Amino acid sequence: MAKVEDLRQKSDDQLAEELVQLKKEQFNLRFQAATNQLEAPARIREVRRSIAQIKTLQNERAASAAKA
């Protein structure tokens, strides 16, 4: 899981790209869980939190851009 400080240094495009990758991983993890092939159940939680952190940063940036 990336730290928030590392995520803040990334550009909007990099964040969007990472978000897409995490959503793909989340889909694959859900599929593995449904078929009882999941080896690291904690990874689902990590991916979900990373997605939330990226979305939060994107919303913060959008709000600050709207104010400026």
From Swiss-Prot:
GO terms for cellular component: cytosolic large ribosomal subunit. SUPFAM superfamilies: Ribosomal protein L29 (L29p). It holds the Pfam family Ribosomal_L29. It comes from the Bacteria. The keyword Endoplasmic reticulum does not apply. Signal peptide: none annotated. Gene3D superfamilies: 1.10.287.310. Keywords: Ribonucleoprotein, Ribosomal protein. GO terms for biological process: translation. GO terms for molecular function: structural constituent of ribosome. Belongs to the universal ribosomal protein uL29 family. This is Large ribosomal subunit protein uL29.
